[in-house]
Swiss-Prot record:
One of its GO terms (molecular function) is ATP-dependent protein disaggregase activity. Belongs to the AAA ATPase family. It comes from Bombyx mori. This is Vacuolar protein sorting-associated protein 4. Its EC number is 3.6.4.6. Involved in late steps of the endosomal multivesicular bodies (MVB) pathway. Recognizes membrane-associated ESCRT-III assemblies and catalyzes their disassembly, possibly in combination with membrane. Residues 76-113 are annotated as: Disordered. The keyword Protein transport applies. It is found in: Prevacuolar compartment membrane; Late endosome membrane; Midbody; Cytoplasm. It holds the Pfam family MIT. PANTHER family: AAA DOMAIN-CONTAINING, VACUOLAR PROTEIN SORTING-ASSOCIATED PROTEIN 4A. Residues 7-73 form the MIT domain.
Length: 438
């Protein structure tokens, strides 16, 4: 769409809005005014040539926004009276402001939208389920668990952390750690929000959502606000960013600073894979910045054991150690994928087998009963091999083939790590400059 087309579209929309306004179709007029302003702002940002043209469009935007706000106020008051006229005194507006905040339907609507971000059920992830990351766990216990359990410890100048940033390569357990915090902080309300929960297409609504998020957190103290991929909301300020993004960032800064509000009992927990794009003022609000690195060998060993669980396998402790050594550079998520792929290998053996043989083992229907007529895949040369496919095997007679070391090595060979060296260099540089190791 060219500049003239965008501007013309904006002019057409506000012209229609004015007509609907005159005809007292206020809801339609409000919709058209807001739509028109969006087109005007698009033209200012991307297409308007010259500062004078931009100033002219901005002045028009303010005029139409002012009228839209008055219409919104009128529609909010469910009374049969005329709307505030253009240029009329704002005394009526002041009267409406005197109404109780708790009765504000717009606030209720925004808070209702945010209620969906509250994790009502605990995720059931314990500290022991998170392999490694001891420094990160200790910092989170210090910030969340101890102040709730021993509030008398954190008085006077000794105050708990208000903001913690978890940064590191993708798949290292940042979100998983947040789930563990939600589980262990029994008395806390856990808000898990993403950028989509806070960004709205309506002008001015996004920053109201941010404000209402913190208001909700204050109402449900003690509370934890977890913002995943915080870089999508709070990247560095620049000339070419939208006005909406700038306002969201400003509201975040105001709320996290606690200007005019109390931040006691509220922890903001952020997670990002690309911390270097965060705005410096936002970075300062996160007092603790913890680097969640790729797992070390002992942590990778624990991860292989955790992901295998009680699945039938033939891996020895030595095999596990070898897998941990061979998986350097793999994140926790990468190891999870390797094990999941290896766990599918017995299923593939069943699918491709042309011969089965009888074995004894626990019954698939009752593991406490040992039966002697289970069928498991085998090679054609095995003693007792019966030529058949999985279709011929009764559902309660299949003997599950165990996961073997060769299955794990095959999966490790085909599943590559997802973290690249360039990102690791940037993350280590950020950690050296601003963070601490987790």
């Amino acid at each position: 769409m060219t500049s003239s087309n965008t501007l013309q579209k904006a002019i057409d929309l506000v012209t229609k809005a004015t007509e609907e306004d005159k005809n007292k179709n206020y809801e339609e007029a409000l919709r058209l005014y807001e739509h028109g302003v969006e087109y005007f702002l698009h033209a200012v940002k991307y297409e308007a040539q010259g500062e004078r043209a931009k100033e002219s469009i901005r002045a028009k935007c303010l005029q139409y926004l002012d009228r839209a706000e008055k219409l919104k106020e009128y529609l909010k008051k469910d009374q049969k009276k005329k709307p505030v006229k253009d240029g009329e005194s704002k005394s009526d507006d002041k009267k409406s402001d005197s109404d109780s905040d708790s009765d504000d339907p717009e606030k209720k609507k925004l808070q209702g939208k945010l209620e969906g971000a509250i994790v009502v059920e605990k995720p059931h992830v314990k500290w022991s389920d998170v392999a490694g990351l001891e420094a990160a766990k200790e910092a989170l216990k210090e910030a969340v668990i101890l102040p709730i359990k021993f509030p008398h410890l954190f008085t006077g100048k000794r105050i708990p952390w208000k903001g913690i940033l978890l940064f590191g390569p993708p798949g290292t357990g940042k979100s998983y750690l947040a789930k563990a915090v939600a589980t262990e902080a029994n008395n806390s309300t856990f808000f898990s929000v993403s950028s989509s929960d806070l960004v709205s297409k309506w002008l001015g609504e996004s920053e109201k959502l941010v404000k209402n998020l913190f208001d909700l957190a204050r109402q449900h103290k003690p509370s934890i606000i977890f913002i995943d991929e915080i870089d999508s909301l709070c990247s560095s300020r620049s000339d070419n960013e939208s006005e909406s993004a700038r306002r969201i960032k400003t509201e975040f800064l105001v709320q996290m600073q606690g200007v005019g509000n109390d931040m006691d009992g509220i922890l903001v927990l952020g997670a990002t894979n690309i911390p270097w794009v965060l705005d410096s003022a936002i970075r300062r609000r996160f007092e603790k910045r913890i680097y969640i690195a790729l797992p070390e060998e002992h942590a990778r060993l624990d991860m292989f054991k955790l992901h295998l669980g009680n699945t039938r396998h033939q891996l020895s402790e030595q095999d596990m150690k070898l897998l941990a050594a061979k998986s350097e550079g793999y994140s926790g998520a990468d190891i999870s994928i390797v094990v999941r792929d290896a766990l599918m290998q017995p299923v593939r053996k069943v699918q491709s087998a042309t011969h089965f043989k009888k074995i004894s083992g626990p019954s698939p229907t009752d593991p406490n009963v040992i039966v002697n007529d289970l069928l498991t895949p085998c090679s054609p040369g095995d003693p007792g091999a019966i030529e058949m496919t999985w279709i011929d095997v009764p559902s309660d007679k299949l003997g599950e083939p165990p996961v073997t070391m060769s299955d794990m090595l095959r999966s490790l060979a085909v599943s590559k790590p997802t973290v690249n060296d360039d990102d690791m260099v940037k993350l280590r540089k950020f950690m050296e400059d601003f963070g601490q190791e987790g």
